[in-house]
Swiss-Prot record:
Protein name in UniProt: Sestrin-2
Highest classification ranks of the organism: Eukaryota, Metazoa, Chordata, Craniata, Vertebrata
Species assigned in the record: Mus musculus (Mouse)
EC number: 1.11.1.-
Keywords annotated in UniProt: Acetylation, Cytoplasm, Isopeptide bond, Oxidoreductase, Phosphoprotein, Ubl conjugation
Reported induction: Up-regulated by treatments inducing endoplasmic reticulum stress.
One cellular component (GO) term of this entry: Atg1/ULK1 kinase complex
Role played: Functions as an intracellular leucine sensor that negatively regulates the mTORC1 signaling pathway through the GATOR complex. In absence of leucine, binds the GATOR subcomplex GATOR2 and prevents mTORC1 signaling. Binding of leucine to SESN2 disrupts its interaction with GATOR2 thereby activating the TORC1 signaling pathway. This stress-inducible metabolic regulator also plays a role in protection against oxidative and genotoxic stresses. May negatively regulate protein translation in response to endoplasmic reticulum stress, via mTORC1.
Length: 480
């Protein structure tokens, strides 16, 4: 995945436009047309017009191919092309991805790809399942294991429960789950092996969110459906994504939405400068209100439940188990995870640095790149401080996973995130297999596609960090 050797340069130029400024040779334009013909007109995403990727991401991705070529050899996949709209993030992502799956570590390479299959299967992500099946066999994996989890070693099967919880309800993970995997026995895990497996599971769960959220298409299926198995409403079928943001946006109404968002950001920033922040009690109440209101933020009832494919279902135990709202009416909710009690910076990072130092450093870098990534633009506006908006998105994702920041006013979430954006965020983060093109089109209707991909990067990282915090807290409690 995400590779660039000498052959791959010509392959990716099927997506990249002919070189500007006359640098390329006379056949470049023809090579571009041939590459387009090989893939069809759909491009790497069912949601993003290929013209947008050519316009916004081609040059920056091409500049980064040299870095990727140093890492391995193979092909550039559709996921890399879309993620390459943000090349600084892609570089950081790839370093961790390569470490997890391709360098020496506690777990054999084939086992790591099998764990990735198990993780992607929880979300019915055929794109990732198929990719890791291929790599599993290429790294010497036993083909019998691909017949289903029941053919895999018991040690791998024992990971299924933690995989299930991390994918759907990470707040349920306890030190007893960790103890069950580490206790002495023929099929026990070492702590080093388990840490690598947990990071890999959360990496692949969140990557499935990115695949569904961006409508990534299988490389060999330019005329097919997205990598997701989720059905789209009939009106969406067979309609290529439009390159004009106004076509699906409601035109001037969408432009007014942008202006209204800019005004709300300005007012919030002014109130902060005047030190008109809410009290601690009020901020806690606003979090509880936001958590309760998230119950009402769900996909449309007319979206059908995806039907798991048998080739994917065979890697899943308890397939009916899925995300449930952290706070449900009429039930005893688990206690809120107060971020200050177990932070990534002070607790999670230090633990993983002790047990998996190479991974800890790259994880921390990737989180920082995602959190700080900005081009200071919003739709047609430039020179904008977007930190408040990015923090609202990050904290809302953590909110739906039950994590609260004591120093954050959750009233900002309601002011900055429109309902369609909340629906999209919650769907992609919690049940990504239900994501549709219509959801993608309905939020931020006047924004560039690269900005929507940016939202998906925040989704990927915030979701991964939330699940890791629950898992690492359970390990800390086990060790103490």
């Amino acid at each position: 995945m995400i590779v660039a050797d000498s052959e791959c340069h010509s392959e990716i130029k099927g997506y990249l436009p002919f070189t500007r400024g006359g640098v390329a040779g006379p056949e470049t334009r023809e090579e571009h047309r041939e590459g387009q013909a090989r893939r069809g007109s759909r491009g790497p995403s069912a949601f993003i017009p290929v013209e947008e990727i050519l316009r916004e991401g081609a040059e920056s991705l091409e500049q980064h191919l040299g870095l990727e070529a140093l890492m391995s050899s193979g092909r550039v996949d559709n996921l890399a092309v879309v993620m390459g709209l943000h090349p600084d993030y892609l570089s950081s992502f790839w370093r961790l991805h390569y470490l997890l799956l391709h360098t020496d570590g506690p777990l054999a390479s084939s086992w790591r790809h099998y764990i990735a299959i198990m993780a992607a299967a929880r979300h019915q992500c055929s794109y990732l399942v198929g990719s890791h099946m291929t790599e599993f066999l290429q790294t010497g994996g036993d083909p019998e294991w691909l017949l289903g989890l029941h053919r895999a070693p018991e040690k791998l099967r024992k990971l299924s429960e933690v995989n299930k919880l991390l994918a759907h309800r990470p707040w349920l993970i306890t030190k007893e789950h960790i103890q069950a995997l580490l206790k002495t026995g023929e099929h026990s895990w070492s702590l080093a092996e388990l840490i690598q497996a947990l990071v890999l599971l959360t990496h692949c769960h969140s990557l499935a969110s990115f695949v569904f959220g961006c409508g990534i298409l299988p490389e060999g299926d330019a005329e097919g459906s997205p990598a997701s198995q989720a059905p789209s409403p009939p009106s969406e079928q067979g309609t290529p994504p439009s390159g004009d943001p106004l076509n699906n946006s409601g035109g001037f109404e969408a432009a007014r939405d942008v202006e209204a968002l800019m005004e709300r950001m300005r007012q919030l920033q002014e109130s902060l400068l005047r030190d008109e922040g809410a009290s601690q009690e009020e901020m806690e109440n606003r979090f509880e209100l936001e958590k309760s209101e998230s119950l009402l933020v769900t996909p449309s009832a007319d979206i059908l439940e995806p039907s798991p494919h048998p080739d994917i279902l065979c890697f899943v135990e308890d397939p009916a188990f899925g995300y449930e709202d952290f706070t449900r009416r009429g039930t005893q909710a688990p206690p809120t995870f107060r971020a200050q009690d177990y932070t990534w910076e002070d607790h999670g990072y230090s633990l993983i640095q002790r047990l998996y130092p190479e991974g800890g450093q790259l994880l921390d870098e990737k989180f920082q790149v995602a959190c700080s990534l900005t081009y200071n633009t919003i739709a047609m506006h430039s020179g904008v401080d977007t930190s408040m908006l990015r923090r609202a998105i990050w904290n809302y994702i953590h909110c739906v996973f039950g994590i609260r920041y004591d120093d954050y006013d959750y009233g900002e979430v309601n002011q900055l995130l429109e309902r369609n954006l909340k629906i999209y965020i919650k769907t992609v983060a919690c049940y990504p297999e239900k994501t549709t093109r219509r959801m993608y089109n309905l939020f931020w209707r006047h924004f560039r596609h690269s900005e929507k991909v940016h939202v998906n990067l925040l989704l990927l990282e915030a979701r991964m960090q939330a699940a890791l915090l629950y898992a690492l807290r359970a390990i800390t409690r086990y060790m103490t």
